[in-house]
């Protein structure tokens, strides 16, 4: 079976839903935490799976952020990678942004890995991958990302599917779009 590389492996509705999830959960967390708890939280959604990264000043703030995300509409699951610590400074954020760009550049030029099927998030030197990929694509993406200078650790939160299952999924999505 051939694996689609040009089209997103999520339905158009799932892509839009993920964008809405990110914005809504960001807003909900900022409203819930308020100005009392210092935090820098990044919300990344892929296929209904929500990844929380960043820093929160207190354990209570961390728990509130996670619970808020879990209660949000259309969330399949929440992955908590929030650290209880002082917010990373601008130097660390710039370094993370640069590392994310390097990882994306390497992935886009790697044969048999399709950046269009993944999101790359970097927080404090840790690279997180999210997407819908085959076991081979996941393994290769992990290997490529881990070889980028500055990557302290690489973690995949990708949904792993066989090439056949992805091909069927793409046919189903195409069928839905043609109706």
Where do the model's predicted regions map?
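N-terminal targeting leaders
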Residues: 1-179
């Amino acid at each position: 079976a051939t694996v689609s590389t040009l089209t997103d492996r999520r339905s158009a509705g799932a892509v839009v839903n993920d964008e809405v999830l990110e914005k809504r959960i960001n807003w909900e967390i900022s409203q819930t935490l308020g100005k009392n708890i210092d935090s820098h939280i990044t919300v990344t959604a892929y296929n209904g799976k929500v990844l929380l990264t960043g820093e929160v000043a207190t354990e209570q703030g961390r728990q509130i952020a996670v619970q808020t995300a879990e209660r949000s509409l259309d969330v399949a699951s929440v992955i908590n990678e929030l650290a209880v610590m002082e917010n990373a400074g601008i130097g660390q954020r710039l370094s993370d942004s640069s590392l994310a760009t390097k990882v994306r550049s390497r992935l886009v030029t790697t044969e048999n890995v399709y950046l269009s099927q993944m999101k790359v998030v970097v927080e404090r030197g840790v690279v997180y991958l999210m997407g819908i990929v085959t076991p081979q694509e996941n393994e290769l993406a992990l290997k490529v990302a881990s070889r980028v200078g500055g990557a302290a650790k690489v973690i995949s939160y990708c949904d792993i599917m066989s090439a056949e299952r992805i091909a069927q999924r793409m046919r189903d999505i195409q069928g839905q779009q043609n109706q």
